[in-house]
Amino acid sequence: MAKIIEVNNVSKTFGKGENINQVLNGASMSVEQGEFVSLMGASGSGKSTLLYLIGGLDRRFDGNISVCGQDIGSLKDKALSDLRLKNMGFVFQFYNLVMNLNVQDNILLPQTMNGKKKSELKGALDEILEITGLTEKRKAMPNTLSGGQQQRVAIARAVLGNPSIILADEPTGNLDSTSTEEIMELFRKLNQEKGMTILQVTHSEACAEYGTRIIRLEDGKTVG
């Protein structure tokens, strides 16, 4: 299969002068289209930093990162924004829902903000509501939902545009064990049935095992 993510000799530091912190030090890895990869490592090992670099949320780094055949570091802002909108869905530990919008409007928000009409998105919305088990909650407000349900809304929002890649940063970090299992089963379903490539950062071995492969970060380098 084609490599959809390629990271080559990437280094990243924070701070200046005597306070420089080397988070990544020549990290290299690749993810093939259709894989479900878990990125693991000790706290502070640079897992989330690497995920953010891959997603183009931070472009100050040394080395090369390619996503969907495009060099993240050389893209202009508009081209990077277009790449993210078309090919990437982001899921974070915190759900970041708009509390005065109902479930379906939260899911639609990124697409409508980029000029899509709700009528154009109806079929995709109905499908993703069914996949995420939120059909009966489409008119519910976020404050009436459990943490697991709110994270499902966040996932639905991330995948409504049918991205090639889901980048998930500790997506179950705030959830109980039952909700964690439900969310991980949902990711597996999106990977196996929708063919979405998933790269998740997790500290949980149990969550990592839902994926097809584990990459570990040690001393700023990737192993495995």
Segments (PLM) and residue ranges:
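ABC family nucleotide-binding domain
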Residues: 3-214
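H-loop (His-switch) and adjacent beta-strand-loop-beta switch element
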Residues: 214-224
